[in-house]
Swiss-Prot record:
It is an enzyme of class 3 (hydrolase). One of its GO terms (cellular component) is nucleus. This is HAD-like hydrolase superfamily protein P8B7.31. Its main location: cytoplasm. Belongs to the HAD-like hydrolase superfamily. It comes from Schizosaccharomyces pombe (strain 972 / ATCC 24843).
Length: 172
């Protein structure tokens, strides 16, 4: 458990190269099926694995424990497959294996500006933009800062390191 951090009300994640190491619309091909060895791993039509980066499930659980609203904002051209992967991937949530999508209160996935994703999240949740933190691997999505969202570009290849960010950027 993380202490002495004031967590934001809402943390929003991109999917591709932020939560998992691929583009769901170009690097894998449906149908997806769960791996026989690990319920947190999916296998596509050609045997390519789909899974979260190793630290993601723990980060999502810690944020959930802190009562942070978790969301997805993805400009994928394959929203159906993104949601399908999140539904099929089983990860530990509150002590039992559940679909990964259950971590997220709002999943906004369609091609277009992240500004539109955030406007929908704001309108549906009532959470002020200034209470949102957004993790994404593409600097062009920094545009959401104009709304008041705190943007963090994910630079490290294998780790999100959100907890270090929160320790350094949030009051507590």
């Amino acid at each position: 458990m993380v202490k002495n951090i004031e967590f934001p009300k809402c943390v929003v994640f991109d999917l591709d190269y932020t939560l998992w190491p691929l583009w769901i619309d170009t690097h894998v091909t449906a149908p997806f099926k769960p791996s026989k060895n690990d319920p947190g791993v999916l296998i596509d039509k050609y045997g390519t694995e789909i899974c979260f980066y190793s630290d993601i499930t723990g980060i999502l659980q810690e944020l959930r424990n802190q009562k942070v609203t978790l969301c997805v904002a993805s400009r994928t051209c394959a929203p159906k497959y993104a949601k399908q992967a999140l539904n099929l991937m089983k990860v530990p949530i509150d002590g039992s294996l559940k679909p990964a999508i259950e971590f997220f209160t709002y999943v906004k996935a369609w091609p277009g500006s992240k500004m539109d994703h955030f406007k929908e999240i704001h309108n549906e949740s009532g959470i002020d933009y200034r209470e949102m933190v957004f993790f994404d691997d593409e600097s062009r999505n920094r545009e959401v800062e104009r709304l008041g969202v705190t943007f963090l570009e994910k630079i490290k290849k294998n780790s999100l390191n959100i907890l270090s960010f929160l320790k350094n950027h949030m009051h507590g």
